[in-house]
UniProtKB/Swiss-Prot annotation:
Name of encoding gene: rpiA
Gene Ontology CC terms, in alphabetical order: cytosol
UniProt keywords, alphabetically: Isomerase
Residue numbers annotated as active site: 111 (proton acceptor)
Protein name per its UniProtKB record: Ribose-5-phosphate isomerase A
Molecular function terms, GO-annotated: ribose-5-phosphate isomerase activity
Function noted in UniProt: Catalyzes the reversible conversion of ribose-5-phosphate to ribulose 5-phosphate.
Organism (species): Synechocystis sp. (strain ATCC 27184 / PCC 6803 / Kazusa)
EC number: 5.3.1.6
PANTHER family xrefs: RIBOSE-5-PHOSPHATE ISOMERASE
Sequence similarity: Belongs to the ribose 5-phosphate isomerase family.
Subunit structure: Homodimer.
């Protein structure tokens, strides 16, 4: 691998730690994002070396599918698999109760399906993703079907949020999810009850899913730099 900066060294270390927890003869949920990408790379390395056998993945996004094929991880689907032994995924924010905000990559709907079905949901983050309260540094993503965009934005504003349509980078127009929907990013001054807000938003007609993951994560692996060296801790 090429020389990495401190942030990527943390991501690489925590990705390897997650990959080391994968066992042979298992079905693995493959998450989305820059930290999870390292985990997929290391899983692929272990398969090539023969350290792992009979491991298949269920991707949470087109990005995860592309990376899995690149690194030689066989794939399956929820139509075929009868279980998910472990899911490895990143997060944009993690609070002390292991609640998450996800969706920076606009893949949170598929991620929530796979992560919630997993026997063990393992979250991989660098230390910059840890917050005291959700919403402190990251907007809350909400996936919405296109025809409901304006009504949902009005409803989110009534809930105290400041909604804005996520626009594409290096493309004209809004971000379009793998499901063909739009993403609204919402700023809340304080998310005091994540579980209640998650349910309230998901009950709005036209909302497919939002980026609050409450009570889903089992293990958080955190990459840190201590004395100039990347380390990983668990909580």
């Amino acid at each position: 691998m090429a020389e990495l900066d401190a942030a990527n060294l943390m991501k690489q270390a925590v990705g390897k730690a997650a990959a080391d927890r994968v066992k042979s003869n298992t079905i693995v949920g493959l998450g989305t994002g820059s930290t999870t990408a390292y985990a997929l790379e290391f899983i692929g390395d272990r398969l090539k070396k023969g350290e792992l056998e009979n491991v298949v993945g269920i991707p949470t996004s087109f990005q995860a599918e592309v990376l899995a094929r690149k690194y030689g991880i066989p794939l399956t689907t929820l139509d075929v698999a009868d279980r998910i032994d472990i899911a490895i995924d990143g997060a944009d924010e993690v609070d002390p109760q292991k609640n998450l905000i996800k969706g920076g990559g606009a893949a949170h709907t598929r991620e929530k399906i796979v992560d919630a079905l997993a026997e063990t949901f393992l979250v991989v983050v660098d230390s910059g993703k840890l917050v005291d309260k959700l919403g402190s540094t990251f907007l809350l993503p909400v996936e919405v079907i296109p025809m409901a965009l304006t009504p949902v934005m009005r409803a989110l504003a009534k809930l105290g949020g400041k909604p804005e349509l996520r626009m594409g980078v290096k493309k004209a127009g809004p971000v379009v999810t793998d499901q063909g929907n739009l993403v609204i990013d919402v700023k809340f001054d304080a998310i005091t009850n994540p579980a209640e807000l998650e349910k309230t938003i998901n009950n709005l007609p036209g909302v497919l899913e939002n980026g609050l993951f409450v009570g889903v994560a089992d293990v958080i692996l955190v990459g840190e730099i201590i004395d100039g060296q990347p380390t990983v801790r668990e909580f």
